[in-house]
């Protein structure tokens, strides 16, 4: 629950404590509920984030190359950027990789959002046709449900539409593909 608590703190600092206006916070809360995080812990994390004395965590993206020229993106949450740069550089060096400059590999990746929804009573083709209007790029089914992939910017619109249709969201998140 610690990781989800930190995600809640960062989401509140970035977009405010109201999940109705902060889609990122809404997604993190939903993911917390999916792993049975108690409601008290969620509320405590939101309250802690509203406290001005709380350390300010920032998301920082590091780019580099692993052995054989494999592009690597490392997303971190830190309150001390200098320490984090040193740690990430150390890991790259230990693995015979190299830390790149800003923009050296990020262009190779698409920042996407994804949703896993309950497939009961839903047709994959119908969902795909309906959610293309909200930004969905790829929709497919597997044994755990229906997966929807879309650009990062479409997260709020798709989540709001799924909630308005009362479709159960099993999980949601962000990926770089």
PLM regions and their residue ranges:
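Flexible hinge/switch segments at interdomain interfaces of large molecular machines
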Residues: 1, 19-22, 59-67, 99-109, ...
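Intrinsically disordered, Lys/Arg-rich N-terminal extensions and targeting peptides
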Residues: 1-20
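Translation machinery proteins
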Residues: 19-76
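Short amphipathic alpha-helix segments
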Residues: 43-50, 83-92, 117-134, 154-162
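RNA pseudouridine synthases
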Residues: 63-77, 84-110
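A common structural junction motif
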Residues: 92-99, 133-138, 162-171
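Strongly charged, low-complexity linkers/loops
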Residues: 125-130, 142, 149, 153-177
């Amino acid at each position: 629950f610690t990781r989800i608590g930190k995600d809640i703190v960062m989401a509140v600092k970035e977009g405010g404590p109201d999940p109705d206006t902060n889609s990122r916070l809404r997604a993190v809360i939903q993911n917390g509920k999916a792993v049975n995080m108690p409601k008290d812990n969620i509320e405590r994390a939101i309250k802690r984030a509203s406290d001005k004395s709380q350390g300010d965590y920032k998301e920082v993206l590091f780019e580099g190359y692993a052995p054989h020229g494999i592009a690597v993106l490392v997303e971190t949450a830190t309150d001390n950027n200098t320490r984090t740069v040193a740690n990430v550089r150390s890991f790259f060096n230990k693995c015979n990789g190299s830390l790149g400059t800003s923009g050296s590999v990020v262009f190779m990746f698409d920042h996407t959002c994804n949703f896993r929804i309950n497939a009961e009573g839903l047709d994959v083709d119908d969902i795909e046709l309906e959610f293309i209007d909200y930004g969905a790029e790829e929709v497919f089914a597997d044994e755990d449900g229906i997966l929807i992939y879309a650009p990062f910017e479409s997260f709020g619109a798709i989540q709001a539409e799924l909630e308005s249709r009362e479709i159960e969201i099993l999980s949601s998140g962000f990926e770089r593909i």
